């Protein structure tokens, strides 16, 4: 019983992993460009980084490998470190100027 | 096993400094120990490189060339720490600055010591995350935090691209090592090389991906700019060299993408630099222009152009770090804003600093006695040898365009009348003088005797 449900839930076609991964990467990059709130930008960043993990898992299922999943573990740890640093910077920005939107942090004109 | 000693010394040293800082929060002590740790690791790495040690186990592949690069990275780090301690003291920045520099150099050193994409990623991110932190290290300074956030967002985008590129790479080749692979006309492999190239183009601030560069370099404390604009480039271009030797040549015409990004970067950086009023931003755009030169150098896998690009990156690091360090010494004066008008008649206030900055700028133009000329000449000859006349001619035009804005700053320093009611005093302590002189000597020495550096590069580079 459980096995049949599990086999139905598993993705049958490996290419669906890549499609999902690309959609998430696209949403992440799009969100980084259009969203104004700093925390939302950080969330979009995490989404883009995590889409990489899905692609790796899909490839490992396709090729019966393990390297990709280990790479995915690396990416998870890096995403956590990046989120920690990003939140720290947002906190200090907010503390110095009460800024929480991108249109408020335009002192430097790249 | 001995090949690992430089990294082990640095790692232990960083942990020791973090603990020591709790008990003895003194900039002089931490700075001196940081300098010492980094210098010892650097000298050891160069010594082992000349002895030809290698370590090829686990996922690491440390050969003589990567030991040489480690040595250059650590020695340059120690020079920058040596000459930036007094700046950090005058700006009252956080004490962590010293060991974030060491962490960045450790990350770069891990990055150059492996051919596995996962290990490269971990080293790259150790360096990058430490860089985001060190950009925002100026206490109570809003601009520094803003620059740090912008750098973080675009830098992490590069990480995402690196990850997706590695996913394609493992999909096409079933392994993560950057070694000779045989795949023909494989779309997944072409996408992998594209994404990996985009990730590194973002990190080295090549033109369509350069938007973080001027902001991050302007907002960071100036000695940190001296560090992040130079030392990481050595590590990044070492990885781009790996990609250029194993991955780029496989896809047809991929070298044109690298070359065209280089050309865009060169012209964009060098032309927009003319419009800048701030000397610090001007040097930031100059580094975008230089990213263009280096990518053009890697656009063909020709032994001459590739080895002279690595040579050029190293001597460019010395010249740019020196120029930014002169700026940092000037900035210790409270009213200094890096506006061009501040530089009027600098030679009257401080002949040494004005002369040093002028010499560094001449070096960046690439005028013969300086080492950068040798690098430029080598890239040009290599491009001509591999019949890439299009890129060779554009390379020369781009370099000539670049001369103008460096000369503009020199004209401001030597030939403009000083602004009235200007009574700023420039203090210059012994450490600053020694640090700047060391960079000057390096730029001159490698210009007059380029074979000292070039022989090591040529000996080790193609036998990895």
From Swiss-Prot, chain A:
One MF term in the entry's GO annotations: quinone binding
Keywords annotated in UniProt: Cell inner membrane, Cell membrane, Membrane, NAD, Quinone, Translocase, Transmembrane, Transmembrane helix, Transport, Ubiquinone
GO cellular component, one term: NADH dehydrogenase complex
Catalysed reactions listed for this entry: a quinone + NADH + 5 H(+)(in) = a quinol + NAD(+) + 4 H(+)(out)
Membrane-traversing stretches: 14-34, 39-59, 70-90
UniProt key word Transferase: no
Class of the enzyme per the UniProt entry, highest EC level: translocase
GO biological process: ATP synthesis coupled electron transport
Cell location: Cell inner membrane
Mode of membrane association: Multi-pass membrane protein
EC number(s) per entry: 7.1.1.-
Disulfide linkage: none
Subunit composition and interactions: NDH-1 is composed of 14 different subunits. Subunits NuoA, H, J, K, L, M, N constitute the membrane sector of the complex.
PANTHER family: NADH-UBIQUINONE OXIDOREDUCTASE CHAIN 4L (PTHR11434:SF16), NADH-UBIQUINONE OXIDOREDUCTASE SUBUNIT ND4L (PTHR11434)
Job description of the protein: NDH-1 shuttles electrons from NADH, via FMN and iron-sulfur (Fe-S) centers, to quinones in the respiratory chain. The immediate electron acceptor for the enzyme in this species is believed to be ubiquinone. Couples the redox reaction to proton translocation (for every two electrons transferred, four hydrogen ions are translocated across the cytoplasmic membrane), and thus conserves the redox energy in a proton gradient.
Family: Belongs to the complex I subunit 4L family.
Record's protein name: NADH-quinone oxidoreductase subunit K
